[in-house]
């Protein structure tokens, strides 16, 4: 009986697939297995296409492995026990798997499918590995693909990589909607690659080490740099807060967007085609948004405002820690007065000086003018700071003047206050000349990563806040059509070339018949002396009457300290 079974086994052996020998083969074994399946199909049907061959060979890996039968032998069904019958009852059913209808148990299908999942995960891992190699190769080459000496520094290459990644992953957020899962997955994966560099930026720290004999000695050990330990986790949390905020708008259906130029947008009273012509127009129901959605939008705006303020604070601190390049210092004039101009210099040297009132009197009707004013004050701050440092060597210093130390410190503090107000009032403004110069010539990789990461989060938060304010503004204009007509009239006046040169002041609710004349410097000084009323009330009134400003829901201007202490949205929607 034993010999008969051995002979039967030898009879079946040539028909079995010798897996052990295939595993021992070299790389050609993979081609051997494919030749067995592909060639057999092509011999049977020479005209078969590649797609059919791939489908049949791919499904061969999930076919049930059955014992080989003899030529004349018929398959004998095995009688299952009662326990097996009860266990398999309800489990076995006809399942269509890759075009084949066979009777499999669900466990068999799951095992086969998990095998395919493992293969797909492996190929995804290989693809991600190649992407990582490509990205870090560009970083090591300094963005110079020729491999020459024209590449940028590692700090600037990482900064540009983070900036370009944010631009390609998020793009320009034109609608208040959730970001797709593919974009979020790509963003989290690739930003993790770039931030992993900070794990290897260390600093020496003294620690006490106890020897075997009980003696103690102080040794230097390495740990991650302190500023990176505090800033990187904070920025990651802000990143998640922004993505979660956008995800919450996934299922909303009360407002929608229409493309500019469509028939529905032409019938709208919105001025989006004028001040934000590149953005789709927000459409809300005729009766406006529901109270639930309004409260939700306000809460999300407060959350995004917190993210914006935190990212701005981190970015400002990092830029302050960066060294000022010598090329920027060489381009500065010798006096701060020459950088500001005579009129601005006289205004900031007044004994009764108010930074908020100063900004209200300046022409901030365009982003170019705001950026120009910011560049002037940053240059003057650098000049005065260098003079304060070099005050002890007046005879040999080219920066020496007749101004006293207290006067320079006072001017430097006033200029710094104005810069803080500009940054808080216009968070979406472009980078100044000093900031660009610092980023370009910075050599600290840790500071470069924190600065670029905080900058893109600041820009993203500002954009999301602007989209939320667009929806709230559309709801306000829908409920109050007269306000929309007033806004259209004001926008047309500001676009008129005849009225651009003169400062045009008008109330949004009560437009005066005559325009106020231009206020000269002497009138401003006399007004400051003779007026006994609080200057805050006039500041609030003039803020509402500024033609270049957008329609504001509040009639009270928030100061810089109030903006930092609360979550009120800054008036950042002008240039977004």
From Swiss-Prot:
GO terms for cellular component: plasma membrane. InterPro entries: PRONE_dom, RopGEF. The PRONE (plant-specific Rop nucleotide exchanger) domain is responsible for the GEF activity. Keywords: Guanine-nucleotide releasing factor. Disulfide bonds: none annotated. Residues 119-485 form the PRONE domain. Interacts with PRK6. Pfam families: PRONE (PF03759). Residues 557-570 have a biased composition (Polar residues). GO terms for molecular function: guanyl-nucleotide exchange factor activity. This is Rop guanine nucleotide exchange factor 13. Guanine-nucleotide exchange factor (GEF) that acts as an activator of Rop (Rho of plants) GTPases by promoting the exchange of GDP for GTP. Specifically expressed in mature flowers. Residues 557-576 are annotated as: Disordered.
């Amino acid at each position: 009986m034993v010999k008969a079974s051995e002979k039967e086994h030898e009879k079946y052996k040539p028909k079995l697939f010798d897996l052990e020998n295939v595993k021992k083969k070299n790389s050609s074994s993979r081609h051997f297995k494919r030749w067995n399946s592909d060639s057999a199909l092509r011999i049977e049907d020479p005209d078969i296409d590649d797609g059919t061959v791939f489908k049949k060979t791919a499904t061969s890996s999930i076919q049930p492995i059955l014992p080989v039968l003899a030529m004349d032998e018929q398959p004998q069904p095995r009688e299952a026990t009662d326990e097996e019958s009860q266990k398999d009852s309800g489990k076995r059913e006809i399942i269509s798997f890759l075009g084949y209808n066979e009777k499999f148990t669900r466990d068999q299908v799951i095992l086969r499918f998990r095998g395919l999942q493992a293969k797909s995960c492996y190929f995804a891992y290989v693809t991600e590995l190649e992407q990582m190699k490509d990205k870090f190769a560009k970083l090591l080459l300094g963005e110079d693909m020729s491999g020459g000496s024209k590449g940028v520094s590692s700090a600037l290459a990482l900064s540009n990589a983070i900036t370009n990644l944010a631009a390609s992953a998020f793009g320009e957020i034109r609608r208040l909607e959730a970001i797709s899962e593919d974009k979020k997955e790509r963003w989290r994966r690739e930003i993790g690659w770039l931030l992993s560099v900070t794990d290897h930026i260390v600093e020496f720290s003294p620690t006490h080490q106890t020897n075997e004999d009980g003696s103690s000695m102080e040794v230097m050990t390495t740990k991650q740099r302190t500023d990176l330990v505090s800033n990187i986790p904070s920025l990651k949390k802000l990143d998640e807060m922004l993505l979660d905020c956008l995800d919450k708008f996934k299922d909303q259906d009360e407002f929608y967007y229409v493309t500019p130029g469509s028939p529905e947008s032409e019938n709208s009273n919105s001025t989006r085609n004028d001040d934000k012509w590149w953005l789709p127009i927000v459409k809300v129901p005729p009766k406006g948004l529901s109270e639930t959605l309004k409260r939700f939008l306000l809460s999300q705006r407060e959350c995004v405002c917190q993210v914006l303020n935190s990212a701005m604070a981190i970015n400002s601190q990092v830029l302050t820690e960066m060294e000022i390049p010598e090329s920027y210092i060489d381009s500065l004039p010798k006096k701060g007065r020459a950088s500001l101009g005579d009129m601005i210099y006289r205004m900031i040297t007044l004994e009764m000086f108010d930074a908020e009132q100063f900004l209200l009197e300046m022409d901030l009707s365009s982003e170019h003018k705001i950026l120009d004013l910011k560049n002037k004050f940053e240059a003057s701050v650098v000049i005065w700071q260098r003079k304060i440092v070099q005050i002890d060597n007046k005879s040999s210093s080219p920066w020496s003047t007749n101004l006293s130390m207290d006067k320079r410190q006072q001017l430097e503090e006033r200029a710094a206050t104005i810069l803080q107000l500009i940054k808080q009032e216009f968070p979406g403004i472009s980078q100044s000349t000093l900031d660009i110069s610092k980023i370009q010539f910075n050599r600290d990789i840790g500071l470069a990563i924190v600065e670029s990461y905080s900058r893109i989060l600041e820009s993203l938060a500002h954009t999301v806040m602007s989209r939320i304010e667009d929806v709230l503004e559309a709801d306000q204009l829908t409920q109050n059509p007269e306000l929309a007509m007033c806004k259209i009239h004001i926008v047309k006046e500001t676009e008129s070339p005849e009225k651009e040169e003169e400062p045009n002041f008008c109330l949004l609710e009560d437009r005066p018949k005559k325009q106020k004349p231009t206020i000269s410097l002497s009138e401003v000084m006399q007004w400051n002396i003779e007026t006994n009323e609080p200057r805050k009330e006039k500041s609030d009134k003039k803020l509402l009457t500024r033609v270049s400003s957008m329609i504001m829901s509040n009639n009270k201007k928030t100061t810089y300290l109030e903006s930092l202490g609360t979550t009120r949205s800054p008036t950042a929607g002008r240039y977004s």
